[in-house]
Every structure is written in structure tokens, then in C-alpha cells.
């Protein structure tokens, strides 16, 4: 641990990922990066999410992606962030689709969500740290973060 930041092992990262259900999918779409919040589960050492046709599928299917999930433990006032980098693939084999449909994937947004995407990781990394008291940053810093020149 350096400067109050603890680098997490892959096992610790997966354990933390299992404690939350929403993460952010980062993909390249046409000529720019984009980020989408998605509900997900950890399954067989990978990340699985359910979505409908559209930009997420177009940007993710078959591509290298990044996926991030974070959380805060109010009891210890420690926060964590886990990043999974790897290839995203549509789940298309019938037995895999059936198995995926039985996972506890509950999207927040209504609408058809008949596509399952699995991110197979190349790299899993994470950090845990103590959350700084807001007074550390002072009133000026808070004001500047909400205004634009």
C-alpha cells in the first residue's frame, strides 16, 4: 500500500465486483470513445451483461473494451474501483443463452434486452483507498468543480 492506496489482487477484484450490480462499459463507437452504465454479474471469471440492439452491442461485440465498477463501504469509509479489460463477445450458443438468461441480470431500463454480452478479461486490476473528508478540499474546490468558464 502506498499513499493510502491498496493495489488489489485479481481475487480481491472479483470479490468486490460480486458486491455490486452496476458498472460502466467503455467502448469505441465510430470515431469516439463512449461509456454506458450497465447492470452486470460476474460469471465464470468474466463479466456478463444484458442489453438490447444498439450502440452498446455495435461498439462492444467482438471488440476490446474496458469495464469499471466501484463501491464504497460506509462502515470503513473505504472506496474501491475495479477495471476489467478484455474482449467482449455476444453470447449466441443456445445453451449459453439459456444459462445466461437464468443469471440474476435485472436491467434498470425497460425495453427489449435480448442480447447477452460476455467480457473475457485479459487484465483485472483494482485499488482500494480511504475516502477523503470533503473538508480537505475546501469550499473553493467544490465551487470550481460545478462551474464552467
State each model region's role.
Residues 46-48, 118, 125:
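General beta-strand recognition
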Residues 58-64, 129-130, 137-141:
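A short, polar/proline- and glycine-enriched secondary-structure boundary/capping micro-motif
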Residues 31, 55-57, 133:
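Short, surface-exposed beta-strand-loop junctions and turns on beta-sheet-rich folds
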Amino acid at each position: 500500500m502506498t499513499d493510502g492506496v491498496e493495489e488489489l489482487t485479481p481475487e480481491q477484484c472479483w470479490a468486490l465486483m460480486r458486491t455490486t450490480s452496476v458498472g460502466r462499459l467503455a467502448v469505441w463507437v465510430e470515431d469516439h470513445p463512449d461509456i454506458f452504465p450497465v447492470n452486470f454479474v460476474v460469471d465464470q471469471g468474466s463479466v456478463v451483461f444484458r442489453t438490447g440492439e444498439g450502440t452498446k452491442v455495435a461498439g462492444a461485440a467482438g471488440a476490446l473494451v474496458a469495464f469499471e465498477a466501484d463501491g464504497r463501504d460506509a462502515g470503513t469509509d473505504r472506496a474501491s474501483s475495479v477495471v476489467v479489460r478484455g474482449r467482449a463477445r455476444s453470447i449466441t450458443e443456445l445453451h449459453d443463452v439459456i444459462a445466461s438468461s437464468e443469471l440474476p441480470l435485472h436491467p434498470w431500463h425497460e425495453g427489449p434486452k435480448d442480447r447477452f454480452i460476455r467480457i473475457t478479461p485479459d487484465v483485472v486490476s483494482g485499488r482500494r483507498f480511504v475516502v477523503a473528508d470533503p473538508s480537505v478540499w475546501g469550499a473553493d474546490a467544490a465551487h470550481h468543480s460545478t462551474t464552467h468558464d
